[in-house]
Amino acid sequence: MQWNQKESALLKDLKGQEQLCANKYSRHADAAKDPQLKQLFSQLAQQEAEHLNTITELERGIIPQMQSGGSKSQPTFTAAYHGESQEKQLDCFLCSDTLAGEKHVSQLYDTCVFEFSDARVRNVLNHIQKEEQEHGKWLYDYMSVNGMYQ
């Protein structure tokens, strides 16, 4: 499949954002204090790496088959923090940072879905966008349980 100039530029943009997200989640997994959050960030880093691979395939003109449904099973969280602490402040910062990134990437996919002429590509991008929205929901759930989201 050949891409026009605009489609190529958008794929390059998406690839850069997915790489940034994967790297950020990996680093944040190392920095997080709560083991639940470390696990969540590690899981999200893996999923962002999968998104990066999908976008790389698209760049090469290969339209991958997407699995039906959304991401993996929804994680559940228990409160790790009661009251304020430096650890909670750090984990809150890491969550806020990644949640802002998910919002940005989701908006980028929202734009891209309408810019590609091939319906199969739009379906792939839409699938990834749904997973990005799930990531945001998981971050919100963790923050909410720990009194970090107001």
Feature map (PLM): residue ranges:
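Alpha-helical scaffold segments that form or flank carboxylate-/histidine-based iron centers
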Residues: 2-13, 35-53, 91-95, 119-133
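Alpha-helical bundle segments that constitute or directly flank the non-heme di-iron/ferroxidase center
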Residues: 2-33, 88-116
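Arginine residue identity/basic-tract feature
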Residues: 27, 60, 67, 120-122
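Preference for long, well-ordered alpha-helical segments
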Residues: 101-150
